[in-house]
Amino acid sequence: MTERRRDELSEEINNLREKVMKQSEENNNLQSQVQKLTEENTTLREQVEPTPEDEDDDIELRGAAAAAAPPPPIEEECPEDLPEKFDGNPDMLAPFMAQCQIFMEKSTRDFSVDRVRVCFVTSMMTGRAARWASAKLERSHYLMHNYPAFMMEMKHVFEDPQRREVAKRKIRRLRQGMGSVIDYSNAFQMIAQDLDWNEPALIDQYHEGLSDHIQEELSHLEVAKSLSALIGQCIHIERRLARAAAARKPRSPPRALVLPHIASHHQVDPTEPVGGARMRLTQEEKERRRKLNLCLYCGTGGHYADNCPAKASKSSPAGKLPGPAVEGPSATGPEIIRSPQDDASSPHLQVMLQIHLPGRHTLFVRAMIDSGASGNFIDHEYVAQNGIPLRIKDWPILVEAIDGRPIASGPVVHETHDLIVDLGDHREVLSFDVTQSPFFPVVLGVRWLSTHDPNITWSTRSIVFDSEYCRYHCRMYSPIPPSLPPPAPQPPLYYPVDGYRVYQPVRYYYVQNVYTPVDEHVYPDHRLVDPHIEMIPGAHSIPSGHVYSLSEPEMAALRDFVARNVKDGLITPTIAPNGAQVLQVKRGWKLQVSYDCRAPNNFTIQNQYPRLSIPNLEDQAHLATYTEFVPQIPGYQTYPTYAAYPTYPVGFAWYPVGRDGQGRSLYVPVMITWNPHWYRQPPVPQYPPPQPPPPPPPPPPPPSYSTL
């Protein structure tokens, strides 16, 4: 019974599809016939002019013709107007439903019954969507006669449940970047269609993605009350800034027109004006060019008028080659907005990348996709300017040019750390080899292409990441770490590298939560706590401070703190005469107990092993991950407040700052300077302090001259 029912449904759907196609063909034939009759009627009316005495007869004839002619048929759709096949893609569900609704609304006479509508929508499905429809109609027969319920079931199955979450994530990451306001506004409104935000929320989010110069100009204007008004203001500001920038450009003086070099055997036609419209050739000139086998268009030999190069150079603008334009839609999707440059379009495939550095602003950089490059490369000057952390490669790589010779910059010995890189809504973790690439700061080569296997349309410069690797690895959105807190005051250290300010290490940012209340009882390497304390002999005579009384809430908080730490084994009985100073701070609804152990440490024996595993704790230069250049401005107060003396850069080097988890060295770019006043600089402290030199060995005993 089930197979028979399925066959009946399939046969009925096929019959309806054939009827729709036949009806469309008949409509097309009727339209062509009506058009021919209309043209013939118009021609006859122009040829025959009615006389005044035959007006009554003409009126009767026209009335009879109007009565005999059938009414004009309702304009029907061509087969090309049918909706596109739906294969179950959630992104194409809304357009498919809208196309089906529009098609059926235009032909209400044919789709007046729900059964016909359901069969038509089912016939427009393919793949897994068609399999779902057949199984659903077989189990639920009532859906065949209930079109709204069938559409609701299809929407419930194929609609993306995370559509709003994805749109929210996209719109928060959307930035104007180097693109225009119009492109940014179009992308913003496309994403906002999937959100249920109100007008003020959309206005605030639109403000967040604008570029800095547009936001600065908006601060001088009145606040817009709607999103459309705000978009209009931004477009007006951008055009005004573009006009001002064009007016500031120096105008080049007019250049004299230089005629191209013409062969001596060619005679210039004086009837052809330079730069104007071409005049018709005389019959004598045509005959002369035909006899000499010259081109009828430009008058030179070697070709004919069909493939004359002068036509191509005239049709294409100056500076561009003839042919289709190479600038197409953005290759990074609606999240990153790119605009083509004002100059001639580049023959290379370029995309806009976003490089996220923890605790720092996002870097926007143009990258070239080159299938001839073996790896992913980044320019060393760009690395030095932006302070991107590096490490030494396990094995150096020798890069060869197209002629087989090694490049002038030498082998590649450094690479960047794993960086979070965005290409539109495509996010990945990349590591670049550092080399010399002045024209393109970033180059994505065969390694990147083979890993992601993108679908590139070279004619339109569009990229689609639809491979299995990208589906499971690259479309996972991970939150970008927030900005780092302001750096703590530096210790009083000074190095003769004036002009560079040292910052706290970024690599320790990922372990900043090791001292949270969740991890306060966890020790590294499962090491057991050793609370044994040894006192200095005679510590009982050390004077103690004052003892103050506590209130009932403070005493209860102190008892709870002591009981909890005794239970965890962090506090044990001791024979020390004095304890640590206790200070209670109100945090929210409870009192937080803090204590100062500096006084008890004065009469206890300190352990000799280092208390932290961070190497060279006191040396801030070893902890630096990047440096920032500080310009020499008169009156600029340097930090620390030591007197700054002029230094002279003599070279560039990579400074070691530590090792990563795999044991590879970490390097940062620094400037090597020479300071002639080095003797006037404060002394550099050493950690640990240097040990005194060992005493000299005793002198050898004097030789003995005793004889036997």
Curated annotation (Swiss-Prot):
Can be reprogrammed to form virion-like capsids that deliver engineered cargo mRNAs bearing RNA signals from PEG10 5'- and 3'-UTR into target cells. Homooligomer; homooligomerizes into virion-like capsids. Interacts with ACVRL1. Interacts with SIAH1 and SIAH2. Expressed in the cytotrophoblast layer but not in the overlying syncytiotrophoblast of the placenta. Expressed in prostate and breast carcinomas but not in normal breast and prostate epithelial cells. Expressed in the Hep-G2 cell line (at protein level). Expressed in brain, liver, spleen, kidney, thymus, lung, ovary, testis, reactive lymph node, skeletal muscle, adipose tissue and placenta. Expressed in pancreatic and hepatocellular carcinomas (HCC). Residues 21-74, 310-344, 683-708 are annotated as: Disordered. Residues 26-36 have a biased composition (Polar residues). There is a cross-link at residues 311, 314 (Glycyl lysine isopeptide (Lys-Gly) (interchain with G-Cter in ubiquitin)). Retrotransposon-derived protein that binds its own mRNA and self-assembles into virion-like capsids. Forms virion-like extracellular vesicles that encapsulate their own mRNA and are released from cells, enabling intercellular transfer of PEG10 mRNA. Binds its own mRNA in the 5'-UTR region, in the region near the boundary between the nucleocapsid (NC) and protease (PRO) coding sequences and in the beginning of the 3'-UTR region. Involved in placenta formation: required for trophoblast stem cells differentiation. Involved at the immediate early stage of adipocyte differentiation. GO terms for biological process: apoptotic process; cell differentiation; mRNA transport; negative regulation of transforming growth factor beta receptor signaling pathway; protein homooligomerization; vesicle-mediated intercellular transport; viral translational frameshifting. This is Retrotransposon-derived protein PEG10.
